[in-house]
Amino acid sequence: MGSLQKILPEAVSEAVEEAFLGKLQAKIFAGANNLVLAIRAVQAAYGDAGVETIRRAFAESWAETGKEMAKESADNPLRSLCSTLEQTCMGSHEWIKLEDSATRQAYRFTRCMWAEAFRELNAEDIGFWVLCQGDASLASSFNPLIGFSRTKTLMMGDDCCDHVCYLKTQ
C-alpha cells in the first residue's frame, strides 16, 4: 500500500504519480533539513536543555493531534485511528497490513520518506523523537483504550517499522 491512487479523486498515470511523489520527497527533505538546522542551532545556543524543551513540545503536539483526530472518530476507535493514519501515510510511506481485526491492526512499513530524509541529514536521532516517538502518545491520546507497540523503525536503520495498534484488555 501507499499509492496515491486511493486518495485522489480520479486515477492518474504512473508517471504523474511518480512526479508528484518526487516533489513530495523534495518537500519532506526541505522540511526535515530546516527542522534539523533549527534544532542544532538551539542546541548550540542553549545546550541539551533547549533540545529537551523542543522534544517536550513535540510530544505535547502529538498528544493534541490524537485528541483532535478523535473528535472525528467513527464507532470503532481502533479502526478509525488506523484508517486516518493510513490516509496520512499515503504517498510518503509504503506498507503491508499484516493484521486487520476489530481489536488489533498490525503493519510492516517498508518505506518512509521522512526516515530517508533524516538519514540523509545524519539526524536520525532528531527524526526519531520528532516523528517516531509521537506514535504511542498519538494513539493513547486518541483513545486511552488503544495501545501501540513497535520494536523496529526505519528511522533508526531497521529493515522496517513494525507498528501494532491494539485495544487494551480491561
Predicted segments, located by residue:
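N-terminal accessory segment detector
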Residues: 1-104, 113-131, 145-160, 167-170
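A helicase ATPase "motif cassette" and its flanking acidic/Ser/Thr-rich regulatory loops
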Residues: 107
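Ligand-binding pocket scaffold of soluble enzyme catalytic domains
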Residues: 136-137
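A contiguous catalytic/ligand-binding core that recognizes phosphate-bearing ligands
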Residues: 140
